[in-house]
Swiss-Prot record:
Species of the source: Homo sapiens (Human)
Cofactor(s) needed by this chain: Mg(2+)
Name of the protein described by the UniProt record: Tubulin alpha-1B chain
Domain-level remarks: The MREC motif mediates interaction with TTC5/STRAP and may be critical for tubulin autoregulation.
Gene assigned in the entry: TUBA1B
N6-acetyllysine PTM positions: 40
Pfam families: Tubulin, Tubulin_C
Length: 451
């Protein structure tokens, strides 16, 4: 069995976790108490959803997940919410005092008190697996727990489970909507620490999701519930191939193989289509060609950046629902001729395709329409460097005046870590720049460099 363990860190991670597990349960027909009427093999079995759920002898399905937060309020909502019976109480781990938006608290002072407990719980989950495939880590860049504790956890997971892949779903701080002044600090510190430990990181930018909710779903003032339900659809599309049997299934390691050309350049851009409200869906036929084309619209991306300014290094299309390979090939052929999609010259224009016959499910009473087919595109493009540049610029503005730095130093960090992290980010921007440069011109000087 190829199991995956999901780890939800901090408020953002936990709330996205709630949305994701709610959706998974609906997709698999699992009730909030963990019973699954459709499941014929009690207490085990080798169904594909067992990658995400373990089964007890009583026929209860328990998510292979850990929820961690350094303060109790958010996870208390899970403990009292609709799905309280779904999770094992030990899977919900809370501390006493929060990280106060401070990376240093999440990583050093408060985080280190709880890390061993968390790893212990993860070990228990891992021991139940026959062939653990890897970890999915959900967190935000801006929060103290999401940035600091996640980077600590990733370092420790690399030590304990060296060869297992670690994928991140990271909430990138929105350019306009900010929940904390120090988000740029936390984001850059966590990216620097996690860069060498993460195999692939899907970034989601709150502002991009806000815009999609406003524009496509006509929600004037989107709440976090709206955002998380949309994010959970994307996560579900990416993980569908692990949870269902499909025609062209995609494994966790397969994502990395196809999307990550160099270890550091592992930030694919996710795009999902169709995002459409019920009243509109009734009047539109959403063919494979249409939804595939929608994926190349910058408006449907999960991070604000413009792929038309960048070059694609790899592209992966994950379809679900009523889709046949013939339609997909036709759609891709059309896009290759019509769209001005620039690939880097060292990469042939390959599109990796996954098809899953399970149609998308929507949360009843939610904003999204039930559609026959959907697609999630994961593309590795040099344009995402724009997002890093934005963040680095904000970091520089504050750090030039050393604003707020004393809070971090007071928690046992050294100022050198800031400059070290910033240099690493500058190197990352440079890496993206070099990857996009055509290889023919720079042949002479490139020879000496090792990759």
């Amino acid at each position: 069995m190829r199991e995956c363990i999901s780890i939800h860190v901090g408020q953002a991670g936990v709330q996205i976790g709630n949305a994701c597990w709610e959706l998974y349960c609906l997709e698999h027909g699992i009730q909030p108490d963990g019973q699954m009427p459709s499941d014929k093999t009690i207490g085990g079995g080798d169904d594909s959803f067992n990658t995400f759920f373990s089964e007890t002898g009583a026929g209860k399905h328990v998510p292979r997940a850990v929820f961690v937060d350094l303060e109790p309020t958010v996870i208390d909502e899970v403990r009292t919410g609709t799905y309280r019976q779904l999770f094992h109480p030990e899977q919900l781990i809370t501390g006493k005092e929060d990280a106060a938006n401070n990376y240093a608290r999440g990583h050093y002072t408060i985080g280190k008190e709880i890390i061993d407990l968390v790893l212990d719980r993860i070990r228990k989950l891992a021991d139940q697996c026959t062939g653990l495939q890897g970890f999915l880590v959900f967190h935000s860049f801006g929060g103290g727990t999401g940035s600091g504790f996640t980077s600590l956890l990733m370092e420790r997971l690399s030590v304990d489970y060296g060869k297992k892949s670690k994928l991140e779903f990271s909430i990138y701080p929105a350019p306009q909507v900010s929940t904390a002044v120090v988000e740029p600090y936390n984001s850059i510190l966590t990216t620097h620490t996690t860069l060498e430990h993460s195999d692939c990181a899907f970034m989601v930018d709150n502002e991009a999701i806000y815009d999609i909710c406003r524009r496509n779903l006509d929600i004037e003032r989107p709440t976090y519930t709206n955002l998380n339900r949309l994010i959970s659809q994307i996560v579900s599309s990416i993980t569908a191939s692990l949870r269902f049997d499909g025609a062209l299934n995609v494994d966790l390691t397969e994502f990395q193989t196809n999307l990550v050309p160099y270890p550091r350049i592992h930030f694919p851009l996710a795009t999902y289509a169709p995002v459409i409200s019920a009243e509109k869906a009734y009047h539109e036929q959403l063919s494979v060609a249409e939804i595939t084309n929608a994926c190349f619209e910058p408006a449907n991306q999960m991070v604000k950046c413009d792929p038309r300014h960048g070059k694609y290094m790899a592209c992966c299309l994950l379809y679900r629902g009523d889709v046949v390979p013939k339609d997909v090939n036709a759609a891709i052929a059309t896009i290759k001729t019509k769209r001005s999609i620039q690939f880097v010259d060292w990469c042939p224009t390959g599109f990796k395709v996954g098809i899953n016959y399970q149609p998308p499910t929507v949360v009843p009473g939610g904003d999204l329409a039930k559609v026959q087919r959907a697609v999630c595109m994961l593309s590795n493009t040099t344009a995402i460097a724009e997002a890093w540049a934005r963040l680095d610029h904000k970091f520089d503005l504050m750090y030039a005046k050393r604003a707020f730095v004393h809070w971090y130093v007071g928690e046992g960090m050294e100022e050198g870590e800031f400059s070290e992290a910033r240099e690493d980010m500058a190197a990352l921007e440079k890496d993206y720049e070099e990857v996009g440069v055509d290889s023919v011109e720079g042949e002479g000087e490139e020879e000496g460099e090792e990759y």
